[in-house]
Amino acid sequence: GALSGGGEEYKIRKKLIENDLVEAILVLPMKMFYTTDISVTLWILNANKKERTFEQNGKTKIHRDRTNEILFMDLRKLGVAFEKKFIQFDTETIEKISSTYHTWQSDKEAYEDIAEYCKSATLSEVIAKDYSLVPSKYIEFVNRDENIDFDTKMTALQSEFVELLKEEEKSKQELLTVFK
């Protein structure tokens, strides 16, 4: 796809990154749109990532200098069921996403990378990954199996399996007795 593909897509993506136009990449959950059930990616492009102060809705906003940075957000685990087969963001989720993005834009000290959710990557990190914009290459994912003692777990599963086989054999014998 456009996030990591080769050929013309690679050339376009590389130019966008080299020209520091990519501000953020947000991966949405699957089944958010009626026309496709695949995960859609939002590219937020910004030609002015320099520090600046501006007015918005009657409030003064300050954006920090985000030159050579890209925010990656993986939103695939967020959202609530809608019309049985679709996913949508509720107000709380929208506020969480918006808060993360705006905090990243304005206050580097308050923003923090969160495993399985968001990561602020530098241009050098993106170049090191050959200009890939696939969020999973940057966002840390937690290996939940890491803390499992394999030998203990395997012994427990084997014991459970032996018990199930014994129960199966007992049930077979009971069935044979009934049908005699």
Language-model features: where?
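A conserved structural/catalytic subdomain of Rossmann-like adenosyl-cofactor enzymes
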Residues: G1-K180
